[in-house]
Regions:
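Bacterial Sec-dependent N-terminal signal peptides
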Residues: 1-14
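Accessory carbohydrate-recognition regions in carbohydrate-active enzymes
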Residues: 13-180
Length: 184
């Protein structure tokens, strides 16, 4: 019993930071089906950028070679090779609001994209916004730092999700208070 107590103390005495050896961008290349975003072990949230959402290539909604971010979704499947989740796309924006399907997307330089376990950040050049993401086991936290306070907004897209083809989605703004949509 005493030997077990000594051995268990040594196992928990290791204060090394092993996260510095983790590169969340590994596996993000074409058809890797992994994402670089923030998540926690056994957590329900995997918040990450979306660079595409149509076709098998985008099962995790992120491909490293892309240069356009559609927004940030709150849950992903990592490395599965199948499409699901990718719910609640959120995107900070500036300028005139639009109903255009792709009007809120933004380019980003790879030199200003950073990820470590539990944290992701990127600078969106079109929107002129720094986006930072982190996660708890049940909640995603987003922080947006705008270069200018003029015409800032946050788009929340409840319809977004990965799809085999773009015909799987349909939505129609019937009025300012009524949205009709379906996903197959």
């Amino acid at each position: 019993m005493g030997l077990f107590g000594i051995a268990s103390q040594q196992a928990f005495a290791d204060n090394n930071d092993y996260t510095k050896y983790v590169d969340p961008f590994v596996g993000n290349a074409d058809n890797g089906h992994t994402f670089p975003g923030a998540c926690r072990p056994f957590g329900m949230i995997q918040t990450s950028p979306v660079t595409g959402g149509v076709g098998w290539r985008y099962c995790a909604e992120y491909v490293y070679s892309d240069s356009l971010i559609w927004g940030f979704t709150q849950d992903h499947l990592n490395g599965t090779g199948c499409m699901d989740l990718g719910d609640i796309l959120v995107m900070p924006s500036t300028g005139k609001r639009t109903r255009s399907w792709d009007g809120y997307r933004s380019h980003f330089p790879k030199t200003q994209e950073f990820a470590t376990p539990g944290y992701y950040s990127v600078y969106l050049t079109d929107a002129k916004v720094k986006a930072e993401l982190t996660a708890t086991p049940h909640v995603a936290f987003h922080r947006y730092t705008y270069d200018s306070a003029d015409s800032t907004s946050v788009l929340i897209d409840l319809q977004h999700g990965p799809a085999w083809n773009d015909k799987q989605y349909h939505s129609q703004a019937v009025s300012y208070t009524h949205l009709r949509a379906h996903e197959t």
